């Protein structure tokens, strides 16, 4: 992406489920960096009244709605991970809409650089719209452990998500920077702080 005067230098942040990318993202926010999360944008585009939600209900039926009209994400997740073709259809519907929301928001950034967080940064091709890719990496056993502690889900469902996500080796192949998050939160913060200073240097800001 060509960086114009009103367009920020964008860092793409990604990692598999349970890798700790959300904790890394929170640290960037604490450091004053403008950030948008693809998961947040994905919620925005399927709010009641938005066209994407109507398309999802038309395809999957009213069983994917909660009583208040909101999308039942757990029900939809079970449907798409049981059927790769359905997952591909959903991604084809949502990715362009999510991208529009994200880059419209990032264009308003006032920090020296901005962070775009997405678990599908590589798969969606949106890493091409960033200037640098940071991958948060963790051993798969630790990803499984963290996800089971955090979410009300089964080991089988977590494994299905891991299997559906991009292979770890392929994700790392696209990385400009890698943070191995296999210790505690303080260790993660230390690595993010160091990279933050580096990114400020790249942007000509003050470390």
Swiss-Prot record:
Keywords: ATP-binding, Coenzyme A biosynthesis, Cytoplasm, Kinase, Nucleotide-binding, Transferase. It catalyses: 3'-dephospho-CoA + ATP = ADP + CoA + H(+). ATP binds at residues 18-23. Residues 10-207 form the DPCK domain. Its EC number is 2.7.1.24. It is found in: Cytoplasm. Its main location: cytoplasm. GO terms for biological process: coenzyme A biosynthetic process. Coiled coil: none annotated. SUPFAM superfamilies: P-loop containing nucleoside triphosphate hydrolases. Signal peptide: none annotated. Pathway: Cofactor biosynthesis; coenzyme A biosynthesis; CoA from (R)-pantothenate: step 5/5. One of its GO terms (cellular component) is cytoplasm. One of its GO terms (molecular function) is dephospho-CoA kinase activity. NCBIfam families: dephospho-CoA kinase. HAMAP family: Dephospho_CoA_kinase (MF_00376). Belongs to the CoaE family. Catalyzes the phosphorylation of the 3'-hydroxyl group of dephosphocoenzyme A to form coenzyme A. This is Dephospho-CoA kinase. It comes from Pseudomonas putida.
